[in-house]
Amino acid sequence: MALVFELMPNGSLENWLHESRNMSVGQRLDVGIDIALALDYLHNGCEPPIVHCDLKPSNVLLDEDMVAHVGDFGLAKVMFDISGEQSTTGQSSSYAVKGSIGYIPPEYGMGSKISPLGDVYSFGILLLEMITGMRPTNNLFTDGIGIHEYVMNLLPDNASDIIDSTSLRSDGTTDEKLECIVSMLEIGVACSVKILVKE
């Protein structure tokens, strides 16, 4: 048996955010929407629901039209309850939690069960990284201050100080673009709030 995948000639989002390539504000917005739609499908369109568990820039692939596709489902979990039936609580019976540092919810390290909320958290961190250009593992983030707290403390008044300058250079800054960027940052902050998923 062989698996055949669609060619993704534009590589991963990681390459566009942290190498020599530049993404415009519009492209970043489109990619964010594509990822949100993919997560909505996994969490609400699949039967049973699937939690990706490893959403990060290197697992987002871009096709020839710069449409984002979520890939690498090696850590994904199907949401079943202990009896083997689909979970109605949105929690899984699995305690084996893996993922990428900086993107995985801190609650998973405290024994919380896997939940779609974990993917929402990872999506929020990913949005913040897309707009700031800073990895969540940046050395700037110490003493309990992560990318979430960093952005939250600067919004909305100092948003222009935290925006990745390459996105603004590629297509210029306007009030409309800045408003769009601030909205994306606010969504990223809202999604990456630490929420304990109860047992």
Task: Enumerate the predicted regions with their spans.
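Cytosolic eukaryotic protein kinase-like domains
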Residues: 1-33, 66, 70-199
